[in-house]
Amino acid sequence: MALYGKKTDLSSASSGGYTGVADVYQLWHYHARGNGNIGDKPSYTLEQARDQITRGNITWNGEKVFGKSAALTYSFLQSVADSDMPDNFKGFVKFNAAQIQQTKLALQSWADVANVTFSEAKDGERATIQFGNYTLTPDGNTDNNSQAFGFYPGNWKWAGSAWFNYNQADNQRPDINEFGRNTLTHEIGHTLGLYHPGDYDASDGNPGYKDVTYAEDTRQFSIMSYWNEGYTGGDFHGYHAAAPHDIAAIQKLYGANMSTRTGDTVYGFHSNSGRDFYTATDSKTPLIFSVWDAGGNDTFDFSGYSANQRISLISGTFSDVGGLKAMVSIAAGAVIENAIGGSGHDVIVGNLSDNRIDGGAGNDVLYGDGGADILTGGAGKDIFVYAWEKDSLSSAPDTITDFQRGEDRIDLSAFNKNHDLRFVDNFSGKGNEVVLNWDSQSHQTNMWLHLSGHETADFLVNIVGAALQPSDVIV
């Protein structure tokens, strides 16, 4: 999977010392994957990981029937005799109120991303997906070791059922930010046809990360994984809804839900998403999610955090938010248009949409990418980065709303790898020229770049409220 598709190699642009370009370049390539090995394991593209997690080719519509929606029912079992329990487990306990509530939220999170609907079965109706607890091992002893198990779609009695060890406290109270919610979502994934990313199982003895098929088999990339995200550089203690590879996998099986959050949705602080895992209520709330969003003009609002953050609006990439690493991502195919940073020193990278990016307080680095972006640095010494001419075309220019001379800088060093970019009063037609034109009526500087030597400038940025000078520009 090509995540970036840039035409400019920025690695050498930052070689002469610190520039904002260096930070942008690092974030572009943060957790890039699918190119060679990481350690002794191959790195998988999104498509390879998706196919690995769906390698059983099982759906509720039949074997190898992909992309077709499914209307499923669920129920909470009320009683099961020991002789009738699956895999010879014993000691049935029905779901408590907390489990029922959290299960409905977990089901909802799967329905958000794929064309599966869930409705509670009527009394006496055999549900597609059934939930129950167990407490005893097959030999009748108290089970203090296992966590849970679930069965794939099928046509036998316990196909599509999920079972949880009631002796585990986090299964009894599977709240958000607790492992029990992760377990619920994981087991529901099995009932929908998702496999572990590798050929391992808790019943296989003592499997470990050494047994993975590919390097990204951790909970950073898939809630179906057994392995801690620390193996791949994350540090956020697991998802509570589908992760990037899971979203791609479940959408392969049932199709993408294109009616999910088609309005203007805010994720993070001031969230209107209606989902607990997308919502931060205070600076101590960890945000751990991979967002699927089908439309609208949407915003990442991470304004309540004081830690330095790295926020990427590029589909398929990860962000460091709220002091944790790689715990927010955007699922492939989803578009988030806007970002608001916090009071730390943030790096924010936009995408090809018309982005609104607000760095907040702190010394921030902002990069809008393509589109007619509106960039606000906020308080602090900010750097506005441009990497190639399509970042701010003269036909669709960016606007920097609050440039402060002597504090902020504009970084054009990516254009100047040959050290031939020069400031002039008027274009000569030779190319690689910059004109700074102060417009007293609009109270803004128009920064024009003429790279090709043609009659029309290739690049324009409008800088509000500042009579820009060459010393304000990093070349």
Curated annotation (Swiss-Prot):
Q: What is its main location?
A: secreted
Encoding gene (name): prtG
The name under which this protein is listed is: Serralysin G
According to the UniProt entry, the note on domains is: The Gly-rich repeats may be important in the extracellular secretion of this metalloprotease.
Task: Please tell me where Ca(2+) 5 binds in this chain.
Answer: G360, G362, D364, G377, A379, D382
Residues annotated as binding Zn(2+): H186, H190, Y226
Q: Which residues bind Ca(2+) 3?
A: G342, G344, D346, G359, A361, D364
Where is Ca(2+) 2 annotated to bind? G296, D298, E337
| GO molecular function terms noted in the UniProt entry | calcium ion binding; metalloendopeptidase activity; zinc ion binding
Which organism was this protein described from? Dickeya chrysanthemi
Which transformation does this protein catalyse, written as a reaction? Preferential cleavage of bonds with hydrophobic residues in P1'
- Recorded superkingdom: Bacteria
Q: Which SMART domains match?
A: ZnMc
